[in-house]
Amino acid sequence: MQNQKFIKVIKNNDTATYINIDHVAMFYVGKDEETTIVNFKNGEKMSIKEQVDCFADRISM
């Protein structure tokens, strides 16, 4: 097992999703302050309109 850094995204129905921080170039709050914009290293963008817990630790199997 190896310790990796993830961004933890809490969805409105209290389920969580994890994005591997190694794939993320940067992220920032959007204009409406409820949206988080994630820029990936491969050039893709993702807009998250949910609560984001940045740099959450998670053990990856």
Model regions and ranges:
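Acidic, Ser/Thr- and proline-rich intrinsically disordered linker/docking segments
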Residues: 1-18, 23-61
